[in-house]
């Protein structure tokens, strides 16, 4: 097994020799040369958030809450296009905002989670689409509540270092405290919720902090077995953000992080967002990714609106050029489709 020390040494090295050695190891563990993706619809239920991250443009003071009719319209269109995943997302703890609460009450809901539950339930009852929710920090009871209407859920760890809470990236973001995020990911494991997490590359973290974060994810997965995929997401400069002058991670920096993550995490799928890496995506295929994540024929990436999705044919072409077969998957990985990992009512739709 790759040790923490060896992994940090690899990231610090500027020699090509270790890269070639790692590539040989990756080729020896390649998962049948398959690369997966999920055909999805991105539904930003509300774009207010208690966190003000130095790299994000999703949050808006002049927020919008999507109406149920707006959500239904997207879901029905997505269903007609053959999508199988609905990514429901909103900012963290939106109920802290009194104006958000007032609007939800006018819509007939006590809080945002009650509204989300209703949307997910409608999705399951009226379409072939399966809900996946990523909405920031949730406690044990909230996760348990949403498990009934979600096949999987997600939360980026981002980084396990508390030091970043004092930097421009997270100094105004109480929900980015890694203790809170680790607690939620562990609670999802206790509840047997198939889970997506990941780390951000290029937000001011050190090589050691990157590796520690990957090993923290490994620790949680070894304890609960619930992490189905890990996203290695590169920071991208956006106009007007506090981190506008930060340097984006280089392709080789990302390539090495993908390789080392795959060798550390072994059976967990590794994903790099294809819309953030259109020119370098093939490099990451060589480096060990086995999933492209959600790709939508209908909706944009509301977190990275400047980066359009590649179409499925484009992904297929550059997968095939390296001998990979592109395969569609559900928002829940096949090994989790059983009564231990999914609500019995949802399971009936899948078997």
Curated annotation (Swiss-Prot):
It catalyses: 5-amino-5-(4-hydroxybenzyl)-6-(D-ribitylimino)-5,6-dihydrouracil + S-adenosyl-L-methionine = 7,8-didemethyl-8-hydroxy-5-deazariboflavin + 5'-deoxyadenosine + L-methionine + NH4(+) + H(+). It comes from the Archaea. Its EC number is 4.3.1.32. Binds 1 [4Fe-4S] cluster. The cluster is coordinated with 3 cysteines and an exchangeable S-adenosyl-L-methionine. The keyword Iron-sulfur applies. Keywords: 4Fe-4S, Iron, Iron-sulfur, Lyase, Metal-binding, S-adenosyl-L-methionine. Gene3D superfamilies: Aldolase class I (3.20.20.70). [4Fe-4S] cluster binds at residues 49, 53, 56. GO terms for molecular function: 4 iron, 4 sulfur cluster binding; 7,8-didemethyl-8-hydroxy-5-deazariboflavin synthase activity; iron ion binding; transferase activity, transferring alkyl or aryl (other than methyl) groups. Its cofactor is [4Fe-4S] cluster. Transmembrane segments: none annotated. The keyword 4Fe-4S applies. NCBIfam families: F420_cofG, PRK06245.1. Catalyzes the radical-mediated synthesis of 7,8-didemethyl-8-hydroxy-5-deazariboflavin from 5-amino-5-(4-hydroxybenzyl)-6-(D-ribitylimino)-5,6-dihydrouracil. This is 7,8-didemethyl-8-hydroxy-5-deazariboflavin synthase. It comes from Methanococcus vannielii (strain ATCC 35089 / DSM 1224 / JCM 13029 / OCM 148 / SB).
């Amino acid at each position: 097994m790759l040790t923490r020390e060896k992994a940090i040494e690899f990231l610090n090295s500027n020699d090509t020799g270790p890269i070639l050695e790692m590539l040989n190891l990756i080729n020896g563990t390649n998962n049948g040369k398959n690369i997966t993706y999920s055909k999805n619809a991105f539904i930003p239920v509300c774009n207010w958030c208690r966190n003000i991250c130095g790299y994000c443009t999703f949050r808006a003071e002049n927020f919008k809450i999507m109406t149920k009719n707006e959500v239904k319209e997207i879901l029905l269109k997505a269903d007609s296009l053959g999508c199988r995943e609905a990514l429901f997302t909103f900012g963290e703890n939106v109920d802290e905002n009194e104006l958000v609460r007032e609007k939800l009450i006018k819509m007939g809901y006590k809080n945002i989670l009650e509204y989300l539950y209703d949307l997910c339930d409608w999705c399951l009852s009226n379409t072939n689409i399966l809900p996946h929710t990523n909405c920031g920090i949730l406690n044990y009871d909230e996760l348990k509540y949403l498990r009934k209407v979600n096949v999987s859920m997600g939360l980026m760890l981002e980084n396990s270092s508390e030091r970043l809470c004092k930097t421009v990236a997270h100094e105004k973001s109480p929900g980015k405290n890694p203790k809170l995020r680790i607690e939620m990911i562990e609670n999802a494991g206790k509840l047997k919720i198939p889970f997506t997490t990941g780390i951000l590359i290029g937000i001011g973290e050190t090589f050691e902090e990157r590796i520690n974060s990957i090993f923290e994810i490994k620790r949680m997965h070894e304890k609960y077995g619930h992490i189905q995929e890990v996203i290695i997401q590169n920071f991208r400069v956006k106009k007007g953000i506090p981190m506008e002058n930060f340097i984006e991670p280089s392709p080789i920096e990302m390539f090495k992080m993908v390789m080392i993550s795959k060798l550390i995490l072994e059976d967990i799928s590794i994903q790099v967002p294809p819309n953030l890496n259109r020119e370098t995506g093939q490099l990451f295929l060589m480096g060990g990714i086995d999933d492209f994540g959600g790709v939508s024929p209908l909706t944009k990436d509301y977190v990275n609106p400047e980066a359009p999705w590649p179409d499925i044919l484009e992904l297929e072409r550059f997968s095939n050029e390296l001998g990979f077969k592109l395969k569609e998957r559900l928002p829940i990985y096949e090994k989790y489709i059983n009564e231990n990992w999914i609500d019995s009512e949802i399971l009936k739709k899948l078997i």
